[in-house]
Amino acid sequence: MKNKRVLAKITALVVLLGVFFVLPSNISQLYADYEVVHDTFEVNFDGWCNLGVDTYLTAVENEGNNGTRGMMVINRSSASDGAYSEKGFYLDGGVEYKYSVFVKHNGTGTETFKLSVSYLDSETEEENKEVIATKDVVAGEWTEISAKYKAPKTAVNITLSITTDSTVDFIFDDVTITRKGMAEANTVYAANAVLKDMYANYFRVGSVLNSGTVNNSSIKALILREFNSITCENEMKPDATLVQSGSTNTNIRVSLNRAASILNFCAQNNIAVRGHTLVWHSQTPQWFFKDNFQDNGNWVSQSVMDQRLESYIKNMFAEIQRQYPSLNLYAYDVVNEAVSDDANRTRYYGGAREPGYGNGRSPWVQIYGDNKFIEKAFTYARKYAPANCKLYYNDYNEYWDHKRDCIASICANLYNKGLLDGVGMQSHINADMNGFSGIQNYKAALQKYINIGCDVQITELDISTENGKFSLQQQADKYKAVFQAAVDINRTSSKGKVTAVCVWGPNDANTWLGSQNAPLLFNANNQPKPAYNAVASIIPQSEWGDGNNPAGGGGGGKPEEPDANGYYYHDTFEGSVGQWTARGPAEVLLSGRTAYKGSESLLVRNRTAAWNGAQRALNPRTFVPGNTYCFSVVASFIEGASSTTFCMKLQYVDGSGTQRYDTIDMKTVGPNQWVHLYNPQYRIPSDATDMYVYVETADDTINFYIDEAIGAVAGTVIEGPAPQPTQPPVLLGDVNGDGTINSTDLTMLKRSVLRAITLTDDAKARADVDKNGSINSTDVLLLSRYLLRVIDKFPVAENPSSSFKYESAVQYRPAPDSYLNPCPQAGRIVKETYTGINGTKSLNVYLPYGYDPNKKYNIFYLMHGGGENENTIFSNDVKLQNILDHAIMNGELEPLIVVTPTFNGGNCTAQNFYQEFRQNVIPFVESKYSTYAESTTPQGIAASRMHRGFGGFSMGGLTTWYVMVNCLDYVAYFMPLSGDYWYGNSPQDKANSIAEAINRSGLSKREYFVFAATGSDHIAYANMNPQIEAMKALPHFDYTSDFSKGNFYFLVAPGATHWWGYVRHYIYDALPYFFHE
């Protein structure tokens, strides 16, 4: 890369000297021969712009002079179109410079190039332009054009341009401007230190440049010394960047020409830039909102404005990246001044300005009807902004109470959705410590915004003396109070930080308020004022840092840090609902009727559906998708049901834009009891955006309460309410419930049978000693025999034999085509996260339509194939959920739970997944969902094995065989699909290994069932069929699909290959045969 040699180096030397002492007046010149400008274009556009509205500049790699990077000029409409660059900062009138540039074109023949200088005469205020060199250039050859030229002494804003006599495309490179003799030193009088270093460990200190001040060498030297953030005063506003010609609804043209010299200065000198601004009711041309991009057109529709807004924001960020990729664009005011000063409008209209154009009215409100455009703008900005660019809402009078509260409400909503990083406080105030913009109101507003959790930047600070009404010392006191407030926030806040304090102008001669109001830190001669010295007195020297590398980059956007308990948030609902809001038409409010801790909890009422609950947005900077966290809340209800199931879930939008709902925890509880919803190891899906944690009930609309809501570091131990004592097991025969079985119980039973007394429900359960569902003389006889010790236990009536209509030779039968469409009685998929022997992993749980946690369900675990994951089976490609929904709705399949785990992750493989299945998956799933497992102890799981199945496709079929061999004590039904058992060297070895596992289990042939399937043209058929034949020969299997008579079947689909489009139908054919024995 070529070395950039610019005047900034000499300026930096002078500035460095200025840090330590005031340059004596007799030292006014440095003797040197030097390059004033050397533009190489190796990284940035170096301040060069298109000359001509349709002309396009682009950097071309390896096509510049000497095979480096150069600048190509294309799409010229006239000979006057070309390229230009403002060089006013580097060049002075009355001084002779040598100008040089290398050019090349690939046209035909010879092209005449022109090198021109234009300038503004500071006395006559006339624009002048002179061609200083012409040269005929042969096609395909790099040629130098050079000339010496001295502009008049009154010349300012000197600009260099390159054109030709035609509209041919051309390339230019290596622009140099040199001078002989003596370089004028920039004398900048300084205090004893510089602001950017003093505050480097707290925040950036910024200032403003515009098209005039950027050409003032004294101001730029001051900027280089004192500040590490720059905002373009007007040059990046919409009227400066929007290009009317050639714009379409989906491609808004933008230009950085007016900002180019400022952006180039910042890029060359590593000064960070605040972008200002994208969306504003003011200084945005009217045509941008009108049909055909004409001022007199009709207002466009919202949908069209959405397109224009997105394109404008997208193209602005893209153009900055294209022209100045090295620029540190650390912050951007996405929306500016959208909230009205009118208290009536902040109270009743969400702060929206009056609709219209001009005089403070908003064309954005004219089109959208309210302030909904704000969220749209931030959504687009978040989509297209560089990752390190923080997004801000910026406004004035931001300390006025009604406006402050409206701004805070808007920004909290945006922040909670992960769209906004901070609030910009413009801070145009006066030197009065009291009154409307007094320091107490100002600090209250600053704290209000910090309490959102976001960062704050003081973006346009100036403190007016109001033409001498306030003294310079009063101004100094106010400046110190503002800076001190920002420092105090950063020293104490556990939430947001102040990441920049930017003054709105370099000196009192360059301020929008007029020099008579003297609102800035330096006077008109760049001398530090008392305000500067006051600000410089706050930070002790021991805390100074490197202003060129401020702490955290000064850009903000850090995630919240957990407190000493590991909590990111802890909502106690004592006096505040915090950031919790209602879902749907529900209402959330504080209540003192009941509380788990303290005196208040959050009441959720006026619910019309089960999903109407309470929610809290999660900040993605803190709760990072893909990472694991702890979530906890306690919940209770008082009346309206005998029991309810509380669910704590995550609502989010996935990578495809689909809204998803994932269960964090769910538990059932009775009235007047608190239940702990708690998952210390919940992994947020990696593609999650727009996240909310919420609490609802499973299937009722009762009022309920929550308390002690916590989001914390993964693994945090949070104690909840003690588990409610469980009912003791029913002691059959103990009719009166006194814990013993004696003649008193027999007497009560007889009197009940004779209808002399009526038993309670609990007594009936104990009196029904044969458990056949009725109380009769058989129970009397059995209890009598038990008391006489004829029997030592009560015989339990056998379950009736299955009424399922088996077929003895099932054939491949695809599900009806309609089953691939969504079902009106759709179940739901819940993504769960658990931590086991192979780390933190996810699985999906299918719950049938009308899932009732008070009922018991059979459960089927279904494994994916190689190269797939837990999401494959329930994806839109496989559509298995639709098939299950239809089959259940039409009575072809009993409602059941289906779980799709994964053998990916950690040290897990398809062969050893059974270990994780036993130790982690079954206990995790069946402790959360209602299956036949009375407990998730090994004994409880084993006791419910006849209600549990396992299957898998391809490599998942391999997993199924390994589960069978190693988990027969836990699983009774197996569905290996298109996968054989990888064991031994022959089909007989495989069959014998399976037989040995059965022998070890001690199970009878009526206690395990295998329904295998594949396609005749599937590659797995060649390996599966010999294994199946060897198994059929074993005495352990009776081959038939009628599981009332046998326990083994192999379904072969004619012509079917390796495709889920077939496999889903295998499941449809086989699954109805499970769980009837």
Swiss-Prot record:
GO terms for molecular function: endo-1,4-beta-xylanase activity. Residues 189-538 form the GH10 domain. Optimum pH is 6.8. Residues 33-180, 565-714 form the CBM-cenC domain. Keywords: Carbohydrate metabolism, Glycosidase, Hydrolase, Polysaccharide degradation, Repeat, Signal, Xylan degradation. Disulfide bonds: none annotated. The active site is at E337, E460. One of its GO terms (biological process) is xylan catabolic process. The keyword Lipid biosynthesis does not apply. Residues 1-26 form the signal peptide. Its EC number is 3.2.1.8. The keyword Electron transport does not apply. Residues 543-563 are annotated as: Disordered. Residues 728-796 form the Dockerin domain. Optimum temperature is 75 degrees Celsius. It catalyses: Endohydrolysis of (1->4)-beta-D-xylosidic linkages in xylans. One of its GO terms (cellular component) is cellulosome. It comes from the Bacteria. Belongs to the glycosyl hydrolase 10 (cellulase F) family. PANTHER family: BETA-XYLANASE, GLYCOSYL HYDROLASE. This is Endo-1,4-beta-xylanase Y. It comes from Acetivibrio thermocellus.
